[in-house]
Amino acid sequence: MKIIAKKDLFINDEIRVREVRLVGLEGEQLGIKPLSEAQSLADASNVDLVLIQPQAVPPVAKLMDYGKFKFEYQKKQKEQRKKQSVVTVKEVRLSPVIDKGDFETKLRNGRKFLEKGNKVKVSIRFKGRMITHKEIGAKVLADFAEATQDIAIIEQRAKMDGRQMFMQLAPISDKK
């Protein structure tokens, strides 16, 4: 049975229903019981009566050590947060008239970011009259995309935004 844990579940005296479908300490079904009988069973076992599914008919209550349950749940949540990887967007700035050596340095940095699992935004800023030659900037972006095609996919094609042209690359995920 999957327990949906909210911030606070109804426990012991907070439960305000007549009867509950009772689940034992080991997960065994104890049947539909009046609330008073369920609470006396919980007291006898020295555990809490926790209403785990209040929307069910009749509501489902379980005998459990609530403190231990809450601790385990928080521990599980913390573990899941650790496993999540945060993807950041790194930026590599280029120029439409970039030299080969500079391009290779920027390319090396971009590849490093992609290998670490980050997305890369490749941008070109047009200065002065360079804006009239957008095709040169598009060629530089295309060369960058072609040089990283073995480890990245184009997430967003080359696009103009004011005096800036950019595209976004994402690492090829291993989870196919």
Curated annotation (Swiss-Prot):
It comes from the Bacteria. Keywords: Cytoplasm, Initiation factor, Protein biosynthesis. It is found in: Cytoplasm. GO terms for biological process: ribosome disassembly. GO terms for cellular component: cytosol; membrane. PANTHER family: TRANSLATION INITIATION FACTOR IF-3 (PTHR10938), TRANSLATION INITIATION FACTOR IF-3, MITOCHONDRIAL (PTHR10938:SF0). HAMAP family: IF_3. Belongs to the IF-3 family. NCBIfam families: infC (TIGR00168). This is Translation initiation factor IF-3. It comes from Streptococcus pyogenes serotype M1.
